[in-house]
Curated annotation (Swiss-Prot):
Domain CBS as annotated: residue spans: 73-133, 135-195
Source taxonomy: Bacteria, Pseudomonadati, Pseudomonadota, Gammaproteobacteria, Enterobacterales
Function: Plays a role in the transport of magnesium and cobalt ions.
GO molecular-function term, one example from the UniProt record: flavin adenine dinucleotide binding
Organism listed in the record: Escherichia coli (strain K12)
Keyword Magnesium found: yes
Family of this protein: Belongs to the UPF0053 family.
Keyword list, A-Z: CBS domain, Cobalt, Magnesium, Repeat, Transport
Keyword Magnesium: yes
Protein name per UniProt: Magnesium and cobalt efflux protein CorC
Transmembrane segments: none
Assigned GO CC terms: plasma membrane
Pfam families recorded: CBS, CorC_HlyC, NMB0537_N
């Protein structure tokens, strides 16, 4: 038995030695800091050692270590909630309309979170008398986390504690939003769409507090109006054109450029055009003004 363990340890050691040697040969030494590691990942993509999706996921994993829950949470104003005194039918109306599976339950307002309701917990009441339904019978305890919690630690907590949603509070104890495990995973693997996600032509969609998805065909005029910017549309009309002009070439997915303090990352592109970008606005910028 000990011989087997010794053989296994030797094998692992040999593998580690092999990969260290490989890194040394390809990249002239192992990375010493975060910037060198990022450069190594990008070089690996350019050398076709990893594909674009893998590169983006590796970069995403590194990015979450620098972010706080406040950066990715769903803002309080966009939270879809249920009220503690709602009937079964009223709850079902909200669930069907939103197609969500978890809901904060409030009493008076969004600062008074009573717990979390999971849509699946309503199924037994749909087969019996709806009058038997009571929110108290299905209410689950809400997990509360501070805005300042690191995203990587939040993901670890989601996994270890096996829950998918947490209520986010500010330093004064007021509710500022909510965060889900899906929000974090989307930072790593990109937007997760399911059968209930509708394909639409919305130009601007919020991903986190400071990051927005923007269609490349969105006009610069509309972007300026929404984000309070002053990008010129004299030479190009669209955000995709603005980004391509700034790069000076057709950028590949994952390439990033800073334009007047706004960080533009190519989220989708093909061999002919940019399709979608992620825009990170400066921390001190006001939230965009969008038509409801």
């Amino acid at each position: 038995m000990s011989d087997d363990n010794s053989h296994s340890s030797d094998t692992i050691s040999n593998k580690k030695g092999f990969f260290s040697l490989l890194l040394s040969q390809l990249f002239h030494g192992e990375p010493k800091n975060r910037d060198e590691l990022l450069a190594l990942i990008r070089d690996s993509g350019q050398n076709d050692l990893i594909d674009e999706d893998t590169r983006d996921m590796l970069e995403g994993v590194m990015d979450i270590a620098d972010q706080r829950v406040r950066d990715i949470m769903i803002p309080r104003s966009q939270m879809i909630t249920l009220k503690r005194n709602q009937t079964l039918d009223e709850c079902l109306d909200v669930i069907i309309e939103s197609a969500h599976s978890r809901f904060p339950v409030i009493s008076e307002d969004k600062d008074h979170i009573e717990g979390i309701l999971m849509a699946k917990d309503l199924l037994p009441f749909m087969r019996s008398d709806a009058e038997a339904f009571s929110m108290d019978k299905v209410l689950r305890q809400a997990v509360v986390v501070p805005e300042s919690k690191r995203v990587d630690r939040m993901l670890k907590e989601f996994r270890s504690q096996r829950y998918h949603m947490a209520i986010v509070i500010d330093e004064f104890g007021g509710v500022s939003g909510l965060v889900t495990i899906e929000d974090i995973l989307e930072l790593i693997v990109g937007e997760i769409e399911d059968e209930y996600d509708e394909e639409d032509d919305i130009d601007f969609r919020q991903l986190s507090r400071h990051t927005w998805t923007v269609r490349a065909l969105a006009s610069i005029e509309d972007f300026n109006e929404a984000f309070g910017t002053h990008f010129s549309d004299e030479e190009v009309d669209t955000i995709g054109g603005l980004v391509m002009q700034a790069f000076g070439h057709l950028p590949a997915r994952g390439e990033t450029i800073d334009i007047d303090g706004y960080q533009f990352k190519v989220a989708m592109a093909d061999s002919r055009r940019i399709i979608q970008v992620h825009v990170k606005i400066p921390d001190d910028s006001p939230q965009p003004k969008l038509d409801e």
